[in-house]
Amino acid sequence: PAEFHAQTAVEAAMTLHETVRGRVDDIESIVIETQEAGVRIIDKTGPLDNPADRDHCIQYMVAIPLIFGRLTAADYEDGVAADPRVDALRDKMEVRENKQFTKDYLDPKKRYIANAVQVFFKDGSSTDRIEVSAPIGHRERRGEGIPVLEQKFVDSVSPRLGAGQWEALEALCADRDKLAATAVDDFMALLVA
């Protein structure tokens, strides 16, 4: 879960996690390139007092996946935000507008929300610059989104249902024709624990 303008920055940071995870203390700086709207709406410095502040801060949304390799709803809560590495990384970030990203954001044929992230280390080395133009689920990446949505459904629903109930729901969802023929009240009954 990430604010719209930061979704691709989060994906770039998750890609970089394996490269930086053992070197977080060695980071000199982090450059985030974004669209004008991203700079205007989610480039935030200073204290972030609550989850609503954090989910509208591109620096926070990049720091978490760089450190932990994930960004979940729980990562916006106080316990995760209290990790001193988060603010230490935020302080090392420079957010800048990439004019091409802004142009592509405003282009109705593209509607990209591109971001790029690159990490620079104290020893002078750096990661690759990871650029992601469109988030998973964008019309150009729709196919990549289906497995992600299916997994999100499994992760959200299966722990709340008994094994037999989950298996029945899973079997129904796997059969498109049977699912389409199922009355809404019968389907909803499968979701009640």
Give the positions of each predicted feature.
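Terminal-appendage/accessory-domain detector
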Residues: 1-193
